[in-house]
Amino acid sequence: MTISKLVLASGSPRRRELLAQMGYQFEVVVPNVEEKRAAAESPAQYVERLSRDKALAGAALVAAEAVVIGSDTIVVKDQQVLEKPRDFADAKRMLLKLSGSQHQVMTGVSVTCRGITHSVVVTTEVWFKTLSEQEIEAYWQSGEPCDKAGSYGIQGLGGRFVTRIEGSYHAVVGLPLYETDQLLHKF
């Protein structure tokens, strides 16, 4: 099947940039999906469901023949999901938890068209240097952590906190290029 219309169901400018980097022409819709983890869901199940919910909600907003991509990214430390911070205190708590240690970034990607949905979860291991309270305060003041899972962006100022990664850099940013391309080739 040739993709006649591709839609990204995401308000994330980073996901738009990454999909464009892959050479795809696409439209953007921003579906309203509640991001609430069910008690029995593992972090991987949660992020996969969110990506699927976003793809399906996006599909409901566009023509039936459209191929729709939904994606979500979470940060996981000790099986605890760290999402976008509510305020400075929340961001500080998260960054102190990540400081000087290893965590996982999980990005779920789902692609749907005409009732068929394919999904993948990409997990990347990330290591942080030890952060001082002054670094955390200055980083918060930059405004960068406000809309990011785990309160940091690897592609921006937060990248200076990362000492090492194992896995997909692009998945940490918000859209794993290889895996997304593989899913799109199923349509």
Curated annotation (Swiss-Prot):
<dbReference type="InterPro" id="IPR003697">
    <property type="entry name" value="Maf-like"/>
</dbReference>
<dbReference type="InterPro" id="IPR029001">
    <property type="entry name" value="ITPase-like_fam"/>
</dbReference>
<keyword id="KW-0378">Hydrolase</keyword>
<feature type="site" description="Important for substrate specificity">
    <location>
        <position position="14"/>
    </location>
</feature>
<feature type="active site" description="Proton acceptor">
    <location>
        <position position="72"/>
    </location>
</feature>
<dbReference type="GO" id="GO:0036218">
    <property type="term" value="F:dTTP diphosphatase activity"/>
</dbReference>
<dbReference type="GO" id="GO:0009117">
    <property type="term" value="P:nucleotide metabolic process"/>
</dbReference>
<keyword id="KW-0546">Nucleotide metabolism</keyword>
<dbReference type="GO" id="GO:0047429">
    <property type="term" value="F:nucleoside triphosphate diphosphatase activity"/>
</dbReference>
<keyword id="KW-0963">Cytoplasm</keyword>
<feature type="site" description="Important for substrate specificity">
    <location>
        <position position="155"/>
    </location>
</feature>
<protein>
    <recommendedName>
        <fullName>dTTP/UTP pyrophosphatase</fullName>
        <ecNumber>3.6.1.9</ecNumber>
    </recommendedName>
</protein>
<comment type="function">
    <text>Nucleoside triphosphate pyrophosphatase that hydrolyzes dTTP and UTP. May have a dual role in cell division arrest and in preventing the incorporation of modified nucleotides into cellular nucleic acids.</text>
</comment>
<comment type="similarity">
    <text>Belongs to the Maf family. YhdE subfamily.</text>
</comment>
<dbReference type="Pfam" id="PF02545">
    <property type="entry name" value="Maf"/>
</dbReference>
<feature type="site" description="Important for substrate specificity">
    <location>
        <position position="73"/>
    </location>
</feature>
<dbReference type="GO" id="GO:0036221">
    <property type="term" value="F:UTP diphosphatase activity"/>
</dbReference>
<dbReference type="GO" id="GO:0005737">
    <property type="term" value="C:cytoplasm"/>
</dbReference>
